[in-house]
Amino acid sequence: MKKKVRTMCHDCHTKCGVVLTVEDGVITGVEGDPNHPISEGMLCTKAFSAKEIHEHPDRLQYPMRRIGARGEGKWERFTWEEALDTIADKMKEVIEQYGPQSVVTAQGTGRACNAWHYRLQSSIGVPGFALAPTHVCLLPNLSQTHVTWGRMFHPHEACDYRRAKSIVSWGSNPIRSRQHSGLRILDSMRDGGKLIVVDPVFRDIASKAEVFLQIRPGTDSALALCLSNLIIQNKEYGAELLTTWSNAPFLVHPEEGRLLRETDINLDADPDADHYVVWNSNTDAPAYWLPEVKSYNIDDVGPVLDGKFTITTVSGTNIECVTAFREYANYLEQFTPEYASEITWIPADRIVAAYEVMISNKPCILSPYLGACMMSSNAVQSGRSITILQILLNPPVDEPGGILFNPIWDVTFDPIITMADQVPGQHLRLGYDKYPMYTQVYASSNWPASIWDAIETEEPWPIKVLACIATDLLGCYEHPQKIHEVLQSNNLELFVVMDYWMTPSAKLADIILPAAHWSERCMGDEEVIPDPCIVTIPQIAVDPPGEAKDDWYFWREMGKRIKPEWWPWDSTEEMYLARLKWFYDWPEDAGWDEAVEKAYIQPTNAGATRIFKQHEKGLIEFKTASRKIEIYSEAMPVYGYDAPFPTYAEPAEGPLTTPELYQEYPFILTTGARDYPFYHSAWTNIARQRVIEPWPYVEMNDEDAARLQISDGEWVYVQSPRGQIKVKARVSKATLKGVISLPRQNYKDDCKELNLPGYDWDQANPNILIPTDGSDPGFGCTPMRGTLARISKAE
C-alpha cells in the first residue's frame, strides 16, 4: 500500500515541512511540503536522508543495561518497563537521601522537548533545565532581550526579512544554518534589498553582500557600538521611539550609577514606589514616570531625550543629571570607525560603508546569531549592543520590515506546561552565585561545568543520577576530557542515555534507551520564525526499529512514576492535544485526526495573527521594571556586568588580554560554523551526508598557510592550552588572516558505506580546545568563538 504522509524534519532547528512516500512500511520518497507556511517546499540534504537514518543498521533498537565495567561494552537487553522502573526508583531514592538537586536530566538542542523536559524537572523538584547547553546557545541572546525588552525572543528569528530594505547577517550563515531565513533574505534582495554580512570567513551568503565586514572573532560589540555612535553623531536615530517607548529620557543619578527616582527629589514621594524622573520640556521641570500605571504623574509631558539638567535633591544639594540616552552617547564617543577598526580588524572605511547602506535603506534589520552574541567572552553585552543598535535604527518594533514579536517563548515556558510556578528552588542550581544571570533567568539550568565538578567532588552537593535525552555530552560541551573522567566516577550511581546510536557518551552509560527518528514519531514544538508563527502537527510515517520510543514517551513515563498527578496522558498524541487546548483554542472534543487534518495551527494566547505595533495598541507590554524598553538596565550590574548599558570587553584570551599566550598560540580560533550536511555532531555516519564533507577540516588563510608551509588538504594539528586535535587544512583567501575556523561537527562516527573512519570524541572534536571557564561575567558563556590556538603540520 502506498501513502503520502505529511510530517516535519527535526534534523536541525529549521524543522521544514516534509511529505514522505511510504509503500508497505518502507520510505520510498522524500519531498518538501509546498504548503508548509515556513519552509514552503524547501528541503536540504538532511531531510532527504530520512530513509537512510530510519533503516541504518547501527540504530539502537532495544533498552539495554550494563553488565560489565563502564565503557567495557558488555550489555544485556531488558524491557522498557524494567528500565523505566529502575531509573525512577533510583531517582526517588536519591531525592529522598540527597534532595532533588542530585538528580540531573539533560537534553540537547531541544528541537521538540523543551517544555516537557522542564515539566519533568519540576516534577523532580527543581525548576528549569537541569542540564542543557544554553550557556552558549540561544539563551544568552534570549536573556538580553528579556532584560532589554521585557520579552524573551531571538532577534535572528524575529526578522521580517522579506519586507526589509537592508539586512545585516551578523555571525550567521542562514543559507546553511536557517534555510528559511536564507530564502527570505534572498527574496528581499530580489526586491532591491541590500545585504551586509559580518563574519570572519567569507561564506555562501557573503557572496551576495553589498558590504562584507570580516571581523576578528569576539569583537562584535565594538562594531555595534561604533555603528551606534555614528547613528547618534549624525542624528539618524528614531527620537519618537526612544522618547515614547524606551527609558532613554530617564535621568541618571551622577553619583550612584543608577536612575534617578522621585524619592531622590520629592519629600512627599511614596517611599515604596519606583517612580522614574524625566525632564519635562513643557514645564521646564521634572516629571515622574509611574510604571505601575504606565503613565506620567501629570498630563502633557514632553520628555527630553538628550540633555543635562540641574536637579535639587531632598537633602537640598544640587546634582547635574544627564539622560540615560546622553550617558550612553558619551560612552559611545570613543568608538570611532578608526578605533573600532583597531579592535575588530575591519578597515574603517568598510565600517562607514556598512553604516551608509543601513541608513540609506530602511527599514534595516539586524540578524545576529551564535557568532555575534552567544559564544564569546562578551556574549550578553554583544547581544545588548546589537539590540540597542537595532532600536536606534528605528524600523523597528513590530512593524513591516522590522522586528516581529513571537509568542513561541510565551508558549514554551508558560507555567501551565512547565509547572515552574509550583516549585521553589532557584538556589538549587549549580552556579547560582557565580553566574547569576544564567541561573536566574527563567528556562535556565545548572551551569554545565559545575555539574562535572559536583560529580567529582560531591560539592556543594553530589550528583547521583544523570539521564541524557538526545544529547551526547562528550560531543556537546567544552573540555570533554574532564567529562570523560567524571562519567566513569563511582560517585555517579546511575548514568542513562537515550539516543539513535551508541554514542561516545552512551558507551559509558549504565542504561541505554533507543530513540525514535522524526519519521517514526509525532512530537514537535512551536516554530521560532514569527511570521507566521505556527505549530506543525506531524504524523508517524513508519514504525520505529525494534522498540525505539520518542522523547516525550520518556518524559511522560518518568513523570508518571515520580509525580503522576502532573502526567495524566497515556500517549504522545494526548500530550500534543493538551498543548493545543492550552494555547491554541483547540476544541475540547476535537481529537488527533482533526489536528492532523488541520496540519498547521497558530497560537491564540499571544496575538499570533500578525497585528503590527502591538505595543501601541496595548496588546503586549514590555515587562521590564520600568515597563519601557530599557536602554539603561539597572538589572545588568545586579547580574554581574560593569555597566547598565552595553560596553566592550576584550576576549578573555587574545593579543591584548593575554599577549604572552598569544605569542605561543598566535591564531584567533573560532569554532562551531554550520556545514550543509551535518547538525552539531550528527550525521557523519550517513553516506548521503558524509560524501559532501568526508574529512574533518580547519579553514585558514592562504598567507598564513604559506608562512607555515601548510598545503591545502594536508593533515595538521590544531592546539590550544587545553588540548590537540588532528584535521585537514582547508586553505583559501576566504578566512581572515590570523584566524582559523573549525566547523561544529566532530566526526565521531565512521561511515561504513563510504569506508570513512570515525574519530571518536577526542581526535577531531573542536571542544577539546575550548576552556570550561565562563568568561562572560554574568552568564558564563565560554569563548567557543574567539579563543587562542596554533596550527602545525601533523606527523
Predicted ranges, named:
Residues S376, D551-A595, I686-E699, E703-E795:
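Long, contiguous, secondary-structure-rich segments that constitute the structural scaffold
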Residues H117-L186, D191-I196, A222, E292-N297, ...:
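Extended redox/cofactor-interaction regions of prokaryotic respiratory oxidoreductases
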